[in-house]
Design a protein with these regions (language model features):
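Amphipathic alpha-helical segments used for helix-helix packing
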Residues: 98-118
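N-terminal intrinsically disordered/low-complexity leader segments
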Residues: 1-8, 191-193
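Hydrophobic/aromatic-rich alpha-helical bundle segments in the mid-to-C-terminal region
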Residues: 120-129, 142-190
Length: 193
């Protein structure tokens, strides 16, 4: 019975922090605000998350997991690698609109860090690497030459991330749509070779 309560408290803390980090950012969200809004004791927070940095890392993993779950659902039944890449841009656009153009959680957090934290840096790099590898795996199904596949994947990933950031800046999906058109053109020219 105790384990269920611990999971519930941990989850409640994480949900509260997720909302606050998303709405007002990491730096503007204080530990005391998280404690107050979650309605928990300070000891409970520190039992589950020894530091704000640890809480942030859990938040980043949660957001990344949610993104990949949504992406998996969005790509269900699509076998063609080119179409999977293109539909990934559509999924991101839907995600951005749904989240009021909040952007990528990893990029948002890292951009707030004048003094980069080792735990958060590692988490962001790990999560971005997972996204990059997603595009690498698809590019390798399109392009048999390993070097060309890597160049293709890196280009797509840069367009994806850059488009995401620009959507956050302009609060509009137009930049991601432009990035998607560039990727379609890139994939089309690759097909014609």
């Amino acid at each position: 019975m105790m384990e269920t309560q611990e999971i519930t408290v941990r989850e409640h803390i994480l949900l509260t922090a997720t909302r606050l980090f998303h709405d007002q950012g990491y730096n503007l969200t204080g530990i005391n605000q998280i404690i107050d809004e979650a309605g928990i004791a300070k000891a409970s927070l520190y039992y589950h998350f020894p530091s704000k940095e640890d809480l942030c890392v859990a938040y980043l993993h949660r957001k990344n997991s949610m993104w990949f779950s949504a992406l998996e659902s969005h790509l269900e039944g699509i076998e063609d690698s080119r179409q999977r890449i293109i539909k990934t841009f559509d999924c991101r656009a839907n995600h951005l609109k749904k989240n009021h153009f909040g952007g990528c959680s990893s990029i948002r957090i890292i951009s707030e860090m004048p003094q980069r934290g080792e735990k958060i840096d590692r988490a962001v790099i790990q999560l971005k690497e997972k996204q990059r590898k997603f595009f690498v795996s698809l590019a390798e199904q399109i392009e048999t030459n390993k070097k060309k596949a890597m160049i293709l994947a890196e280009t797509i990933f840069l367009l994806f991330d850059g488009g995401t950031v620009q959507c956050q800046v302009y609060r509009d999906i137009a930049p991601l749509q432009a990035a998607k058109r560039a990727v379609v053109s890139l994939l089309q020219s690759d097909l014609e070779k």
